[in-house]
Amino acid sequence: MGNIHIQTKSKEYDVHVGKEVLSNLTTIVQNMQPAVSNVMIISDEAVASLHLQTVIDALQVEQHVFSFVVPSGEKEKSFENFYAAHTSALENKLDRNSLILALGGGMIGDLAGFVAASFMRGIRFVQVPTTLLAHDSAVGGKVAINHPLGKNMIGAFHQPEAVVYHTPFLQSLPEKEWRSGYAEVIKHALIGDVELYHWLKEEVQTLADLHDEKLIHILTKAIPVKANVVSQDETEKGVRAHLNFGHTLGHALEKELGYGNITHGDGVAVGMLFAIFLSEQVYKVDLAYEDMKQWFLKYGYPKMPRDLNVERLVQLMKQDKKANAGAIHMVLMQEYGVVNVVSISDETVHIALEAFQKDMV
């Protein structure tokens, strides 16, 4: 078991990581001040069928505990479910001393966190992640829902009271979700922990290696990368944008292909490869792009789809939150462990995307 301390300007809290940390949940809730009045667990159908009762049983508290369950899938991070969650909260008499538990992956963490951020102008919540991908989204306080015109466009910054990362919950994940989450692990290694990057190349030959002590090691190394960035820039005014490495194209792919047709991690993996491909041209450096491409393909990450319209992707990349005055801003890599936000012309991105698309045959 390992505890990772997160410190931001607005709040300090711990991430509890391990095989038995669910037992910490009762103490976490009981120690909150002012005392918690009641507890709302927000989850999705897939996770609830596997883990909801386990969490309710582990949560040995006197307060009223109830659940609100939405269908599974990124498209459910919608205004309709956000509104319905508020209705459920009001019907069950949540108040300003209530607590929301986000039980699920990144979609649920974002949705439940935004409900917590907005209900009565903000109440407390705890993240209980059930995916590897959520090692990224559960930490840092960014919560949001999607808009038909863009991912995570309606949201807030709202830090949790704690994150309880009970690793046995991850064992029920399908392979595509392991791969999706592992992409964010790779991202954290590439931008902030070169030693972890080399460890991954040596120790994680297949996704089947992501278990037990190796999994806990990965989580306790990757999460501090994000924690360090968030401590410097809680509200994404500067270096926190570095955590968007691979996301400019990744989000565009998710939007173009349709949420659920490509996982977030698969999109980010393609986006990271493109960022490295473009970085070599912009910085005139050798980042071993070809080796990186083969490494990604070994894990089963997809290639850049050949049938996608490049100009359409360019326009979607201009809708990215880092864009400024209509110009694309991407996180590019100067060297492993050193990244910067760079303004790139539409023409440069278009030419590079066409070349990248052809290279990914």
From Swiss-Prot:
Q: Which PANTHER family match?
A: 3-DEHYDROQUINATE SYNTHASE, 3-DEHYDROQUINATE SYNTHASE, CHLOROPLASTIC
Any one Gene Ontology BP term: aromatic amino acid family biosynthetic process
Q: Does the keyword Nucleotide-binding apply?
A: yes
Q: In which pathway does it act?
A: Metabolic intermediate biosynthesis; chorismate biosynthesis; chorismate from D-erythrose 4-phosphate and phosphoenolpyruvate: step 2/7
Member of which family?
A: Belongs to the sugar phosphate cyclases superfamily. Dehydroquinate synthase family.
Q: Which residues bind NAD(+)?
A: 72-77, 130-131, 142, 151
What cofactor does this protein call for? Co(2+); Zn(2+); NAD(+)
Q: What is this protein called?
A: 3-dehydroquinate synthase
